């Protein structure tokens, strides 16, 4: 039961992390040539980042791998133990899927549905900035604090150097061996 709680806290922190970010990763202003600015990368991979979730009662640290295809799809793999993926979050600009591999369950939701339960809201651009180390806080570390219910949750991510334009594995996880649950049961 205690492990369930860790998964929920880490999942909530990861999904809420971009809530306060307002800076865009890519400028929407035309460049000197009059064309919109194009991102400097197509794929991005950050391996073995350290994500730490701190609550009033607990502290949980896990390795996180973030794989992104620009404006298309991203995968966040949470591995508290070396090489064992325990939680996976797959996202597209329209949908989020959280997969709990330990308990054999998953939940799907849209950003609109998720934002009915979260305050402030979360969007694709903010999540993509988190997964590519393009946050206004810099490429080395991100730190956020939230109120979730009556509990304060703090998330600290320490990034390793990112690799761009490398092959990434962002194929959808086959969900037929998992049981679908409502996202509200996790949040």
Label for each model-derived stretch:
Residues 1-7:
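Bacterial N-terminal signal peptides that target proteins for export
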Residues 14-18:
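C-terminal motif of bacterial Sec signal peptides marking the signal peptidase cleavage site
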Residues 19-65, 179, 184-187:
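N-terminal leader/targeting segments and the immediate start of mature chains
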Residues 20-22, 138-187:
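Non-transmembrane domains of secretory- and envelope-associated proteins
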Residues 33, 52-63, 68-73, 79, ...:
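A general "mature secreted/periplasmic domain" signal
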Residues 44-48, 59-64, 77, 89-93, ...:
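Extended beta-sheet lipid-handling architectures
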Residues 73-125:
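An acidic-aromatic
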Residues 121-140:
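Charged, gly/pro-rich active-site loop segments
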């Amino acid at each position: 039961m205690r492990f369930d709680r860790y998964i929920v806290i880490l999942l909530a922190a990861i999904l809420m992390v971009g809530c306060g970010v307002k800076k865009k990763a890519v400028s929407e202003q035309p460049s000197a040539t009059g064309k919109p600015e194009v991102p400097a990368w197509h794929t991005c991979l950050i391996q073995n980042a350290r994500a730490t979730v701190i609550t009033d009662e607990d502290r949980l640290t896990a390795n996180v791998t973030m794989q992104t295809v620009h404006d298309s799809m991203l995968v966040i793999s949470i591995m508290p133990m070396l090489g064992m993926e325990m939680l996976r979050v797959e996202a597209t600009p329209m949908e989020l899927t959280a997969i709990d591999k330990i308990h054999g369950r998953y939940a799907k939701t849209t950003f609109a549905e998720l934002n009915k339960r979260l305050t402030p809201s979360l969007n694709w651009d903010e999540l993509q900035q988190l997964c590519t180390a393009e946050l206004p806080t810099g490429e080395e570390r991100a730190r956020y604090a939230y109120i979730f219910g009556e509990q304060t949750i703090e998330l600290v991510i320490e990034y390793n150097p990112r690799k761009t334009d490398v092959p990434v594995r962002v194929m959808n996880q086959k969900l037929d061996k998992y049981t679908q649950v409502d996202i509200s049961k996790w949040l």
